[in-house]
Regions:
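Extracytoplasmic gate region of multi-pass secondary transporters
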Residues: 2, 177-233
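Conserved MFS/SLC helix-loop-helix module at the cytosolic interface between two early adjacent transmembrane helices
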Residues: 29-66
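Cytoplasmic helix-loop-helix junction between adjacent transmembrane helices
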Residues: 73-110
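Helix-loop-helix hairpin linking two adjacent transmembrane segments in secondary transporters
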Residues: 106-156
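C-terminal transmembrane helical hairpin of 12-TM major facilitator-type secondary transporters
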Residues: 244-293
Length: 370
């Protein structure tokens, strides 16, 4: 949509992209209170608010008559979307027998949305109207929230109060070290991942020839296919996270990204598509290990709050990255400087990962989730 709406509202690409900046910042900042409420009130109740709130924001965007309406709707989407990661991930981890694989499968479904969205938006723009691209999913989100509320009140689903498969307590001397490393790596993740996913459609518009992509639908299909294929690396990463240390996983997959990030903007056509697929796959591969680290080094009663703190850092930086990307593009006409920064961030993250503990806590006797 960000490729098409500048023509509708007569705005520069960077300025339109900037309308989502506050929403992306809130996507991160509001994760902390959302996580706290998930720990103190209800995981399911917060997810009901998530679905209904995101749906309302999306419909507002679809009905917008100008930049102000877009800004309000996108900001509401970011605010309510902040609930999912701290509350939803904590809920999933608590129910999981194999946390790594479960997180990996969840990642596939999460990224399936990212894969389908650009295709759906492209189809709506080319064959219906851009407004349908927001109003239709917004209405579905509200209906899903109402459905979740009904099954919750009927007692078919419940909140979780303990891990199904708890792990032994890790060495307390490693707490500070893990916290410092995660602060660095998650900041780098927010910077690179958000910047990559938000600039990928524009990179394709600039780098793909008309023979490959001549319409918004075709660009959307390429973005969707790459996101969809890359999402399967989440399963591989989850499988690895159940067997190997987060330290090894972090180092390998951050290091693999470094050369690609420095050179991707100089590529075009098929080499560009392959490079984007690889770098996105490498980023998604270590997500399960990162989330397991947070779970292993955090008491259950603070679990959602800890995930909230993680996403405050990563997603708030991501929101600023979108603003930076738009500003650099409007000034320079390309993303060369931005991706040089991404490559530098990958080097920093890979180096920081060497400080992580080499092992991982062992599972203790499993207990049922209440």
């Amino acid at each position: 949509a960000v490729l098409y709406l500048p023509k509708v509202f007569d705005l520069p690409y960077g300025e339109l992209l900037g309308l989502s900046s506050l929403g992306l910042v809130l996507f991160g900042l509001a994760a902390l209170p959302a996580g706290w409420l998930g720990d103190r009130w209800s995981q399911i109740g917060m997810m009901v608010i998530f679905f209904i709130g995101v749906g309302v924001g999306s419909i507002i965007v679809g009905m917008a008559g100008g930049p102000d309406g877009l800004f309000i709707g996108l900001t509401l989407i970011g605010l309510f979307a902040s609930i999912y990661h701290p509350v939803g991930i904590a809920w999933i981890v608590a129910w999981a027998d194999k946390q790594g694989m479960t997180l990996g499968i969840n990642g596939v479904f999460g990224n399936a949305g990212s894969a389908i969205a650009p295709v759906f938006v492209g189809l709506m723009i080319d064959f219906v109207t851009w407004r349908a691209a927001f109003i239709v999913p917004g209405a579905l989100s509200i209906l899903f929230g109402i459905g979740l509320l009904v099954v919750w009140k009927a007692g078919w689903i419940r909140d979780v109060t303990t891990d199904r498969t708890p792990t032994g307590a890790p060495d307390s001397s490693a707490f500070v070290r893990v916290f410092i490393v995660l602060t660095v790596t998650m900041a780098c993740t927010g910077f690179v991942y958000t910047g990559l996913t938000n600039t990928m459609p524009k990179l394709m518009e600039m780098g793909l020839s008309a023979a490959l992509a001549a319409s918004y639908t075709e660009i959307g299909i390429f973005v969707g296919v790459i996101s969809g294929l890359a999402s399967f690396s989440s399963i591989f990463g989850g499988w690895m996270a159940d067997r190997y240390s987060a330290r090894s996983i972090y180092i390998v997959f951050w290091a693999l990204q470094i050369p690609i990030l420095f050179f991707v903007v100089s590529l075009s056509d098929v080499p560009l598509l392959v490079a984007l697929l690889l770098v996105l796959s490498f980023m998604l591969a270590f997500a399960a290990a990162e989330n397991m680290l947070v779970a292993q080094y955090t008491p259950f009663r603070w679990r959602a709050l800890a995930y909230g703190a993680k996403f405050v850092l990563a997603l708030s930086i991501g929101g600023l990255t979108v603003h930076l990307a738009g500003w650099l593009f409007d000034r320079n006409g390309d993303f060369a400087a931005l991706f040089t920064m991404f490559g530098a961030a990958a080097i920093i993250a890979a180096d920081a990962a060497f400080m992580l503990p080499g092992g991982r806590p062992k599972p203790v006797e499993a207990v049922g989730a209440d």
